């Protein structure tokens, strides 16, 4: 039996670049700095650009080229109700995306058994627990990446990147015995190392999402 192409809806987590004002050059410079801090995480990653706070005319071709120079792939704009601007963005190759309140992601019924890794996760390695929690009974080196659709438990030092709730589960958490991360992320919201308050550095912590913002708590047990 011949199989045919099938078009289905799906959910993806996308980074959003919020332009705070009309100074697009400054925003692109900031983006370039962020990408330089975690190039393997941002390389060829799709990004949506929120232009809600931009009042002046936008050269969408230059904006697209500027984002591409950072190594990310601009896929769309949001925060724009002006039909003329929407048409200009479309002509430049952007999709026009409307904001919506996403439905709560419920995965518990589909979750698989926890994935357990006993060996160190070395630089350049990536471990992904699809539809599952991930337990690392060792250290995560700089340049390594651990990803889970559920929560991540690291019984060692996290020096690389930890990405929990990769499919959008905001209830996901990250636990680690010694936080020295290059990046922590839950449901698409992320902090780079310079955003992590030094009081949590080298500490036993729990990372959660509260009202769409990352929160870190020190664990005393």
UniProtKB/Swiss-Prot annotation:
The gene is minC. Belongs to the MinC family. It comes from Aliivibrio salmonicida (strain LFI1238). Interacts with MinD and FtsZ. InterPro entries: CAP/MinC_C, MinC, MinC_C_sf, MinC_N, Septum_form_inhib_MinC_C. This is Probable septum site-determining protein MinC. GO terms for biological process: cell morphogenesis; division septum assembly; regulation of cell division; regulation of cell septum assembly. Pfam families: MinC_C, MinC_N. Keywords: Cell cycle, Cell division, Septation. Signal peptide: none annotated. It comes from the Bacteria. Cell division inhibitor that blocks the formation of polar Z ring septums. Rapidly oscillates between the poles of the cell to destabilize FtsZ filaments that have formed before they mature into polar Z rings. Prevents FtsZ polymerization.
